[in-house]
């Protein structure tokens, strides 16, 4: 008996017919046979077949040959099984796949879903990470919550709140990162310490009473607490894109001393033409890896702090371990003392481990102009226990050229 023609007014009818034909044959079916049995043009049939393949409902073991159900990917990554009684969402299918097979790369997940490239599944994976369903270590994806928690969140359709943005309300912010998957966003801040054992000291300006204030970051290991078990710091992954960083310490055991109040600088907008700041002229982005060398036991090995900087404006920043920066501000129009050259100087990093007393404590004027493509008073690198600490001084002067004072020190 001849097959009844398929109503092409709806795609569902054609999908059901294709699945029925493939299921009845029980094996691979040539595209020519499908065209005859479904009685539709080959072009229309192929469009539906490839859509079903992307949904992992059919597979193509050979060219122009189709069979029911998904197939294992060619690189050994297992396929996500199809549940014919229900149609789970892509989120749920990814959760099931990762729970059954463990952490996998994005490409393996994409192929298990019937896709061909990692780019097709990456938006979904990052969306699931923002919902705290998945975690990513830079190589592989894995489940963040337990299976039941992941199912509840995926079925509820409720999106978890994004991590709160921390806005500065105090002279110095101290942020302690806890947990393996904690996420911190910082906006509109300066005088920030990112790392362990850092110290920022803000000295009073000339004529202002009162002692200087120190804001050390709490140490995770205290030798006096003998009854406390040693705990190693967790690895830190820091990404900065189109940001303005002033008086920022990235690394461990850095010291920064500020004499007088920080000058008011014009606000920068990164929406139109962000300044490209880099350690090299060829690459607009830079990455740094830093190892801790702090005292105390480290049961899990040395801690790595990975920092990636792209299109940022950095002023008075230290990147590395054991750096020391002292900043003296000079106001516009100030007369240079005898013996000073007309251009700002960078001190020899090996001549002294103590900060030179400030020659002036006047504030930097609010209309001082800053370059948008330079690193200013920035220390890069690590300081070994045997070497002296570097001292960098910044002098604000009258014009733009003399204000472009960049200090780079690597020991």
Swiss-Prot record:
- Cite the residue spans of the region called Disordered: 60-86, 263-303, 332-411
Q: Does the keyword DNA-binding apply?
A: yes
Q: What happens when the gene is disrupted?
A: Mice are resistant to necroptosis, characterized by a decrease in epithelial cell death and an increase in virus replication. At a modestly lethal dose of influenza A virus (IAV), mice display significantly increased rates of mortality, probably caused by a failure to eliminate infected cells and limit virus spread in pulmonary tissue. Perinatal lethality observed in Ripk1 knockout mice is rescued in knockout mice lacking both Ripk1 and Zbp1. Skin inflammation observed in Ripk1(mRHIM) mutant mice is abrogated in Ripk1(mRHIM) mutant mice that also lack Zbp1.
| One of the protein's GO biological processes | apoptotic process
Crosslink site: Glycyl lysine isopeptide (Lys-Gly) (interchain with G-Cter in ubiquitin)? 17, 43
The molecular function GO annotations come to: DNA binding; double-stranded RNA adenosine deaminase activity; double-stranded RNA binding; left-handed Z-DNA binding
Q: What is the induction comment?
A: Expression is activated by IRF1. Up-regulated following interferon treatment. By lipopolysaccharides (LPS).
Motif RIP homotypic interaction motif (RHIM) 1 location, chain numbering: 188-205
An example GO CC term for this entry is: cytosol
Mind telling me which Pfam families this protein's record contains?
RHIM (PF12721), z-alpha (PF02295)
- Subcellular location field: Cytoplasm; Nucleus
Q: Which domain of life is it from?
A: Eukaryota
Q: Which residues form the Z-binding domain?
A: 8-70, 84-148
For bias type Polar residues, the affected ranges are 268-292, 350-371, 400-411
PROSITE patterns the record matches: Z_BINDING
What tissue specificity is annotated for this entry?
Expressed in lung, spleen and liver. Lower levels were seen in heart, kidney and testis. Expression is greatly up-regulated in tumor stromal cells and activated macrophages.
Q: Does the keyword Protein biosynthesis apply?
A: no
Predominant subcellular localization, coarse grouping: cytoplasm
Q: Which SUPFAM superfamilies match?
A: Winged helix' DNA-binding domain (SSF46785)
The job of this chain, per UniProt, is described as: Key innate sensor that recognizes and binds Z-RNA structures, which are produced by a number of viruses, such as herpesvirus, orthomyxovirus or flavivirus, and triggers different forms of cell death. ZBP1 acts as an essential mediator of pyroptosis, necroptosis and apoptosis (PANoptosis), an integral part of host defense against pathogens, by activating RIPK3, caspase-8 (CASP8), and the NLRP3 inflammasome.
What domain comment accompanies this record?
The Z-binding domains recognize and bind left-handed double-stranded Z-RNA structures, but not A-RNA, the right-handed double-stranded RNAs that are structurally very different from Z-RNAs. The second Z-binding domain (also named Zalpha2) acts as a molecular switch regulating pyroptosis, necroptosis and apoptosis (PANoptosis). The second Z-binding domain is essential for sensing influenza A virus (IAV) Z-RNAs.
> What name does UniProt use for this protein?
Z-DNA-binding protein 1
Q: Which organism is it from?
A: Mus musculus
